[in-house]
Amino acid sequence: MKKPLGKIVASTALLISVAFSSSIASAAEEAKEKYLIGFNEQEAVSEFVEQVEANDEVAILSEEEEVEIELLHEFETIPVLSVELSPEDVDALELDPAISYIEEDAEVTTMAQSVPWGISRVQAPAAHNRGLTGSGVKVAVLDTGISTHPDLNIRGGASFVPGEPSTQDGNGHGTHVAGTIAALNNSIGVLGVAPNAELYAVKVLGASGSGSVSSIAQGLEWAGNNGMHVANLSLGSPSPSATLEQAVNSATSRGVLVVAASGNSGAGSISYPARYANAMAVGATDQNNNRASFSQYGAGLDIVAPGVNVQSTYPGSTYASLNGTSMATPHVAGAAALVKQKNPSWSNVQIRNHLKNTATSLGSTNLYGSGLVNAEAATR
């Protein structure tokens, strides 16, 4: 199954003897919430879906109990289903040995909330002078979409936000991120780190600037399926998600370099998905090469980039200055595109390690990771 399904029914493989005080009718009236069901293996997902199709809008748990469930999406590359069901029914479903976990489909938000010298600071023009502009490199921007803009060349994309089928940006965040990666060298507006990189608008956050784990996981799956070289995730959540970690791992195994924002709370630990081992975690610095006060730091931080007063593209063919680790992350994604153009045979792991090895040290690895991304050194 490769696309969202309508309301259907699931039944577990085992009959679980669980007593409930509520009736089926009252359970049907309970408000449902979104969950992600992780299975031990892909085959178990198929068996579960077959059980779904064999019943009539209920999951049969025992002779006494039936549970309504709505299947929203079946992932292709990770053994996970996105569903809606009553919170009261989660414990019963978790007793199925084929299910490894059930987690809430948590909200994930952008990493910039306030209103770009950064291109020069990371020495991108020096790489441009060598003929390295990101040409031929595909960069997926998993964000609020990207608005049509005279300073951007958007090659395609997809939306995974319910009710927002267009990849146009109703928020501004994604358009700003896209400009830092690849604003065109066309004598107007601003210049991106990799002005000839191919931008793909992968909408996973709505106009409000928030979205769900399932939308982001679908966006990562799309990136892997469509040959993206780099995925920029200027977003995050304080809570871990097994589904999101699997999606990051799957995309990485398919050649995508996942670059993610460390977070904006200023805390001494980084957000998810940046904290996952296969994501490249990016913190923010100011004009003095100091850690930005809001930039989260700590174990797992890979690298830093400019994230204060960053000028970039904005909806309505305009420009805006924003702050955040969201603004730092695309500097690194753009630098990755430059390195990929210079070394087309390199894997995502090689590119990540090279960016870290060529970064300019700023001091404590706890605060700055390997240091400030350096596009000039990375493309020598």
UniProtKB/Swiss-Prot annotation:
Coiled-coil regions listed in the entry: none
Residues annotated to bind Ca(2+) 1: 113, 151, 184, 186, 188, 190
Cofactor note: Binds 2 calcium ions per subunit.
Location relative to the cell: Secreted
Chief localisation class: secreted
Lineage, opening ranks: Bacteria, Bacillati, Bacillota, Bacilli, Bacillales
Protein name stated in the entry: Alkaline protease
Peptidase S8 domain segment(s): 116-379
Stated family: Belongs to the peptidase S8 family.
Top-level EC class: hydrolase
